[in-house]
Amino acid sequence: MRTYEVMYIVRPNIEEDAKKALVERFNGILATEGAEVLEAKDWGKRRLAYEINDFKDGFYNIVRVKSDNNKATDEFQRLAKISDDIIRYMVIREDEDK
């Protein structure tokens, strides 16, 4: 099984209830597509290094998952691309222990 780290930034002007629902939805997408969620961290609101879509800050979320294939991360990326609430995301495959 491979371990992935998924980081995504939610736009800062989202309401708290909508942000909670969005985070649950996207973390749930990873779980329903066969990935095991190892940990999920909410880093809170942080300043961006540069503006993204005229936003100077955003809510950072980091999720570590373990999966046999990349189906879960592919589905996450597909839905994150079309979501207006996620302003940036990144999926990284962690190195396997040797």
Swiss-Prot record:
Keyword Ribonucleoprotein: yes
CDD domains: bS6 (cd00473)
One Pfam family from the record: Ribosomal_S6
Family the UniProt entry places it in: Belongs to the bacterial ribosomal protein bS6 family.
Protein name: Small ribosomal subunit protein bS6
Keywords annotated in UniProt: Ribonucleoprotein, Ribosomal protein, RNA-binding, rRNA-binding
One Gene Ontology CC term in the entry: ribosome
An example molecular function term from Gene Ontology annotations: small ribosomal subunit rRNA binding
Gene Ontology biological process: translation
NCBIfam families: S6 (TIGR00166)
Main function: Binds together with bS18 to 16S ribosomal RNA.
Top-rank taxon, per record: Bacteria
